[in-house]
Structures are given as structure tokens and as C-alpha cells.
Amino acid sequence: MTRKSVLGEVREVQLAIQLIQLGARLQFLESEVGLSRERLIRLYKEIKGVSPPKGLLPFSTDWYMTWLANIHSSMFYNMYQFMKIHSDEEKVWILIKSYKLYLQQIAAQDSEPILDFTRAYTMVRFFDSDMLQLSTCCRCSGQFVAHAHDHKSGYVCVLCRPPSRAGKARGAKRGAEGEAGALGIEGMGFGVEAAPGGAGFH
């Protein structure tokens, strides 16, 4: 085996480790990592201590429209879009770094992540397939995940017009307020126009 192929394999293993630690499913690993299915399964078991979960990947855009899911999804995708514009790295590494940044922001708010890595990856695919879009709220000017081809005029986000049930469950209101603080215009700009000095973009 040549030196180049050895180093290439090391990079693929490092990539697989990063993805598995973030919660990537086997289907995603097979599509993004240049290792055999058998090696990926062995690596997954070694890191997680269990076999990879079975089942289909999420296929509906509707989940991203629900209250807290939309807040978290919008937070992540704005970060991803910013990183994609300002980085020349491979797409998979932009995805990894954006998701880590999302987790850091959620931890800073003393909250729990709603968006897992699989749904984050699937959402990026939905955007690439023109199934989702970012719509600008006419009240706060934040950019939020919405169905593609929905009317953008007069769009009001889930923070400015939360559902009536929002906050009724114990702890939900506190969590939403934390997310709102992280997502607000005064916090991180909530868009690709955000200044590099905004939250997390140092």
C-alpha cells in the first residue's frame, strides 16, 4: 500500500469517527466515507458499544415546521449557510463544524438539542433538492426554515407568533426563551449577513 493511500485511509477513519460521535447513521456513513460497510459497522460498535440502528432516514419536511424544531433547524441552517459561504472545506466537514457549533450554542443556553445530526444532514439535502427555503420574518427580519415555494411576503416566524400551546409543558417556555435569545437579531444576526464577531463566528 502506498503512503498516499495509507494517509487517505487514515483521513477516512478520522472522518468516520467524527460522524459516528455526532450520531450519524450507517446510511450516511456509507455515502460519505470511503470505507467498507463491514469496517464502518466495526468502527461504529467500537465507538458506540452497540450495533448501528436500523430503519429509514427521515423523509418528510413537515417535522422542521413544528415550533421548537423550526427554531433549532433555523439556527443550525443559518450557521451552516454562513460556514459554507466563508469556508472552502469539503461539504461534509462544513456540516460537521456547523453541527458542533449548533451544539455549543444550545449548551450555552443550558438547553437540550432538538435537532439530531441525522435530521440536520437530511435538512441540508432538502435544501439542496429545493424542498426547503429560508424565509425572512417581516417582524424581526430573522431567516427561518420554511417550505420551498411558500409565499415569502408577510411571513411571520415561530418566535414572533408562537403557537398557543407553546410554553405549557414544564420547562418548554424557558427552553424556548433560551433559543430565542440565541437566535435573535441582537444575538447572532440570524442570517448569512451576520458579522464574523457574532455568536460562535469568531
Swiss-Prot record:
InterPro entries: FlhC. It is found in: Cytoplasm. It comes from the Bacteria. Pfam families: FlhC. One of its GO terms (molecular function) is zinc ion binding. GO terms for cellular component: cytoplasm. Its cofactor is Zn(2+). GO terms for biological process: bacterial-type flagellum organization; positive regulation of DNA-templated transcription; regulation of bacterial-type flagellum assembly. Functions in complex with FlhD as a master transcriptional regulator that regulates transcription of several flagellar and non-flagellar operons by binding to their promoter region. Activates expression of class 2 flagellar genes, including fliA, which is a flagellum-specific sigma factor that turns on the class 3 genes. Also regulates genes whose products function in a variety of physiological pathways. Belongs to the FlhC family. This is Flagellar transcriptional regulator FlhC. It comes from Variovorax paradoxus (strain S110). The lineage of its organism: Bacteria, Pseudomonadati, Pseudomonadota, Betaproteobacteria, Burkholderiales.
